[in-house]
Every structure is written in structure tokens, then in C-alpha cells.
Amino acid sequence: VVVIYASMIINADPKLDYSDVLIVPQKSNVKSRKEVCLEVSKTFNNGTSWSGVPIMAANMSTVGTHKMALVLSEYNIVTCLRKGGDYYSSFASANPDKEKYVSLTLGLDAESKLFVDSADIKDPTFICVDVANGYMTEFHNFTRKVREKWPKSILIAGNVVTPEGVEELSKVGVDLVKVGIGSGSMCLTRRVAGVGYPQLSAVLECAQTAEAFDIGIVADGGIIHPGDFAKYFVAGAAFVMAGGIFAGHDECGGEIRHGEHGELRMLHYGMSSKTANEKYNGGLSDYRASEGRTVEVPYRGSVRNTIQEIFGGIRSACSYVGAFDLPSLYTCGTLIKVNRTINNIFENHEI
């Protein structure tokens, strides 16, 4: 009886993260990485079309800035601006030619609700409705309201990590479901709440369900190396969102500090951290725990260097599997489970 009961509450199927797999090389007709095209063209269910590189900078205060959006738009990458209707509107009005590469970000806070009720703006190209727990009925109802207000926008909503979560959001009219709970470098939800899902399995399972409902997923969180972007695309992600890999750059707009040994560092924090709550919510409520980190990351100069590394890594992955573009990376790519992905014996000796 105990065994039967235990099987009801424990799913024993093995679940995988990105560190558990590698992409398998195969015959390739790609002669040079420069032959690989990273731009895609998509038409969504509401008839809206978009072309660009399906990578998104996360809507974190230290990443989703106007400066970041200006630079990433040059590479046709989307920046999900930090939360706030006015923050989006000021960018869109000043840079109408770059609006297609930014997203308005909303939450369940009073400011977001007021903006939806009162804003008189044309449909933004992208809208990201972002909460930590995408399973709440209140979140579903609010997302439906956003869809009704701006029917021509490409609507992103999340986060969830299961096929059931994807199905529920498909019912309220989203185009893209944001997938990932606890996988981000600044997230402590798995430690504090004990909740989460290994990110590779979440993306694989959610992408299959999304395809059945004719929508896509945004794989959000878990990026450590450029190669992880490629793994996301092989797993079926329509877009990949990242925060930590874009942190520490000039475009983040944060204060540059001197570390203990004189090295340059920048502040970076999760949006469920104590720092974020004190800055935007008047402090951490007495019924809540901080579920995000606050760290100082090494100062890395311009984000352009990081973009080159990301693009180069994805192109290299494509060349290894014979893919001339990202849709082909999904159809050609195969992932294999491994015990160890990287030889890091000299990792602390790089110059």
C-alpha cells in the first residue's frame, strides 16, 4: 500500500537539465558558419508577422533597459523591457523604428492593471505578461483581458513548466508560453519553495503540447554557455530568453563598483529578490520570503561582445548538424544524455 501511495505522489520518470545532454554531430554540408542564417520569420494565429533572431533579453531591471534594447535591436534581438507601461511607451515613442524588437512587460501589480485599463496606445508588437507562478486563475483572467485589449500583439505569458500549464494559457489567447520555474541564475524558488522542474524536460514536454495548440514556447532561464541556446532550439523552443548572460554590461545601466581586489563589478538581482521588492514594492512583505539572489557580477564591457559569442556558438552548433538555419537545427538536431559535458580541468587558469 505504501508503495502504491508513494507512486501517486512521486513521478519517477527521469527529468533532464541542459547540463545532462549534448548535441550529436552528424553529416553536414555547411561549409562555413557564415552560411548559417539566425533570423526567422513567423506568422502568429492573430495574423501578426515578425522577423528577427528569436532570442530575448529578460525583463529584469538590470537587463531589460532602454540602452540594452537599442543595441540588441541592431542585431534583431528582442528586449523584454522591465515592467511598466510608461517605460515601454517612452521607448516606443522615441524609437518607433525599433519598437518591433521590444516587449511591453506587465504583471499582476496595480500599476500594470491600471495601464491595461487606461492606456490608449496601438497594439505593441510584443507583450509579456510575467509572473513567477503562471498557474493562478487570476493570472489567466488578466492575460485574457490583455489579449482582448490588444488583439494584434504577439502575446507572451508565463511562467509554467508542464503541458497542463501550456494548455491553460492556450485557452486565453497567448501566442507564446514562457517556460521555466527555478532554472534562472538569479532564482531561488527551488531552494526556498521546493518547486520547479528540470528545464530541458520542461521545454521538451511543453513544446510538444504547444505545437498541438498551434502556439510556441519561450524557453526562459538556465542559460550558462552559448551552447545552451542551441540546445534550447533543438528541444523545440520558438524563442530563447536569457537574463544572466546579458548582465554586467554597459547597457545594463547599473553602477560600476570596485571589488575587493580592485576588479570592476556590477549589481545584478532577481525580480523576486529582497532588493527588487525593496526597490519596487516598498519592501518584502512579512508573509513572503525572498526567492531571488542579489549578486555583483564581473563588469564585461559592451554587450556586443557577448552577442558575438552567442551568435558564434549557435552557428557552430548548426554547422555540426548540417543546419543552415534555426528551423533546420530543430529538425536535424539530436540530443544525447551524458554524465559529463565539459572538461573543466583548466577552467580556473584561463587568461
Question: Language-model segments: which ranges?
Answer:
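Alpha/beta catalytic cores of nucleotide-metabolism and tRNA/nucleoside-modifying enzymes
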Residues: V3-K31, V172, G194-A219, I223-I351
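Active-site entrance/lid segments in N-terminal catalytic domains of soluble metabolic enzymes
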Residues: I4-G216, G244-H249, I345
